[in-house]
Amino acid sequence: MSFTKIAALLAVAAASTQLVSAEVGQYEIVEFDAILADVKANLEQYMSLAMNNPDFTLPSGVLDVYQHMTTATDDSYTSYFTEMDFAQITTAMVQVPWYSSRLEPEIIAALQSAGISITSLGQTVSESGSESATASSDASSASESSSAASSSASESSSAASSSASESSSAASSSASESSSAASSSASEAAKSSSSAKSSGSSAASSAASSASSKASSAASSSAKASSSAEKSTNSSSSATSKNAGAAMDMGFFSAGVGAAIAGAAAMLL
C-alpha cells in the first residue's frame, strides 16, 4: 500500500505536465514537476518514509486520479485534477523531513526558471505587488477619509464659531436693550417717587395746617371754658357766702324767738 501511495504520487506528478484544465495554473504544474524530479532522484527515501511513517498520507483524490490514469486510454483523466486539492498535496509534501533543506529550494528554483518571480512558496511577486497595490489603495482611501474628516471638522468648527458669534451678538444686543429698559424704568420710578414725595409733603403740610387750626380752636375753646369755670366758681363762692349769711341770720332769729318764749314762760310761773 505504501508503494501504491508513492506510485500514485509519482504518476500524478508526472501527469501534471499534461494538465489541460484552465483551473490549474502554471504555478501548480511547475511545483509538481519539481516534486517529481525530487521523488525520482530520492525514491528510496520516499518509499522508506511511506512504509515506516503511518502519518504520511496522500490527500483525498490523489488515488482516484491515479486509478483513472492507469485505466484511461488517453489524457481524459486529467479532467479529474480539478477534484484534487493541490494545497493539501503541498501540505503532505511539507511533512517530509527534507522539505525545508532540499525540496523547497528546488521548487523555488524551478518556479524561477519558469519565469515566475517568487519570494517564498505560496506567494509570487505579482501577488505581493497586488497586495502592495491593495495596501496603497487602502492607504489612499484612508488619506481621503482623513482629509474628508478634517474638512468636515473644519466646516463644523467654522459653523460653530459663526453660531457662537451670532449668539454672543444677540445676547449682547438683548442685554443692552434690557439695560436701557431698566434705566428707563428706574427714571420713571424716580419721577414717580419725587411726585409722591411732593404730593406727600403737600398733604402733610395741609394736614399740619389743619391740625394747627384745630389746635388753635381747641385752645380758644379751652380758654372760654376756663373763663366760664372761673365765673362759675366766683358765682358759687358768692352764693355760698350769701347762704352762710342767711343761715347765720336765721340762727340768730331762732335764738331770739326761743329766748322770748322762755322769758314769757318764766313770767307766767
Curated annotation (Swiss-Prot):
Q: Which Pfam families match?
A: SRP1_TIP1
Q: How does it sit in the membrane?
A: Lipid-anchor; GPI-anchor
Q: What is this protein called?
A: Cell wall protein TIR3
Post-translational modification note? Extensively O-glycosylated. The GPI-anchor is attached to the protein in the endoplasmic reticulum and serves to target the protein to the cell surface. There, the glucosamine-inositol phospholipid moiety is cleaved off and the GPI-modified mannoprotein is covalently attached via its lipidless GPI glycan remnant to the 1,6-beta-glucan of the outer cell wall layer.
Enumerate the InterPro entries for this protein.
SRP1_TIP1 (IPR000992), Yeast_SRP1/TIP1_CWP (IPR050788)
Task: List residues with covalent lipid attachment of type GPI-anchor amidated glycine.
Answer: G245
Q: Which of this chain's residues carry glycans?
A: N234
Q: What induces it?
A: Induced during anaerobic growth.
Region Disordered: start and end of each range?
A: 128-242
Keyword annotations from UniProtKB, A to Z: Cell wall, Glycoprotein, GPI-anchor, Lipoprotein, Membrane, Secreted, Signal
**Family recorded in the similarity comment:** Belongs to the SRP1/TIP1 family.
UniProt keyword annotation of Protein biosynthesis present: no
Q: Supply the residue numbers of the propeptide(s) excised during maturation.
A: 246-269
Q: What role does this protein play?
A: Component of the cell wall. Required for anaerobic growth.
Any idea where this protein resides?
A: Secreted, Cell wall; Membrane
| Organism, scientific name | Saccharomyces cerevisiae (strain ATCC 204508 / S288c)
Keyword Cell membrane (UniProt): no
Q: Which GO terms describe its biological process?
A: fungal-type cell wall organization
Its gene name is TIR3
Give the residue range of the signal peptide. 1-22
Q: What Gene Ontology terms describe what this protein does at the molecular function level?
A: structural constituent of cell wall
CC terms in the record's Gene Ontology section: cell periphery; extracellular region; fungal-type cell wall; fungal-type vacuole; side of membrane
